[in-house]
């Protein structure tokens, strides 16, 4: 059912299209700026009002707020699932509306709040972040996510099957696998749905 829903989403018409002259995103520092961003999903219900902040390269920023305050909306706008109503989102000075969505999304890694794992091995689930990854790369990502020692304690190690949606792992273990997957991708910008670490 989950995959059917995902594929149905992929088949739908995109809300946002690349600009005719869109170029690939060029990242040198990975500085992120939200410049007076306003957004509404519907014209009569504005979610964001003149949001203005910068995240310097190499720093960590937390966005906190009550349910419905727009935290997830910021992430959706950064991924360009929607375009802003007013203002601009820039990465290294480039308006994300002027770059290809593929290059934008390739530059961003996300650890979602609700972890999705496939009914396959731990190695497969981590390697999904970088198709063709070597075992050494998978293990390095797992070490960085502090899950390697746990994996090695399992009888099958990296070949352990995680079960449907990762049901054979605890919530924290699933999140660490998802973190390793994202770290293996080596994104310039990392977005974490909730503080997992």
Q: What are the residue ranges of the model-derived segments?
A:
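Short, small-residue-biased leader/transition segments that mark boundaries at the very start
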Residues: 1-2, 196
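Conserved, function-defining core regions and hallmark residues within catalytic/recognition domains
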Residues: 6
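ABC-type nucleotide-binding domain
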Residues: 11, 16-19, 23-194
